[in-house]
């Protein structure tokens, strides 16, 4: 085999297990695939299929109780499956980069964006501060962030979800690695930003000849972006091949079911029913919300004079790209934000005037389904405790009745 024909990544008979405190449980079973330079391969499967575990093993980021039981992971022809963390650190960022699934938990909240992008350069030998600063601005510009000088000075909480994901991509491409592992890179983003992020990854792949391992549960994304598919179920490959072939003529029952369940592969959207005129449950009038911006005089206006009504029994969609003010508006409606001007009433209650116990009791009226489960759920609490908390806060129920409610909800 000539050097030119060596795949950037070649995984052979990979098996991975986790120790649960009593015994090892194998979660990935004899998985094999390869990716050539400039190629996109998608690992597809439902939650728990072993996609992320497989991807994490490539870059040596398995949890402490996980290990590669068998098989090989060759990067540019070198088997790294048995490498120490110290050896792998030399590869991370320079040869293989990871775009994590969740930008909120992946970025350090107390360090500026520019400092975090620059860290990748410093870890790999860059010493000149001016060169680092210049390269950071180049990277932020390359990933499509406006005002890169301002963004470099900002902290992650000052950016929208799409902006934060672009920062992670800037970190991943800083040293032009041979392989990028994109682990559900757009799952928490709106459709408009999702396409832009995927377009950006595709542009970078073409520019640098980078190989891309795309981890996704979305067959629509895989169909649109990947040269080849590997379909996983319970840690086992169900089938793999060129994307068009797998989608046109799936061989496994599981793949056929995934295709049938994929709304992004041609299913006609449901038509919303017409609503009979009803009293509004929510009324927003002239909503304005300004934010202070670090390192900049004046205020940034995120929401500017929005007004709308939501009738009882209806569904009202707020649509816009990342940074358009959707989330700020919703947080104001539920009483989490403090608007600069305007009036919000929910079931006749002026939300902007609520304080203390009145605001706490208002939480029973309006609840959020959050965008990002990783940063919304307390890792120190069990799932049972998290779901039980609203009942403890707002319902005085006997323990037996509360437990029955809990089991019904679960």
Locations of the language-model features?
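ABC transporter nucleotide-binding domains
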Residues: 1-265, 272-410
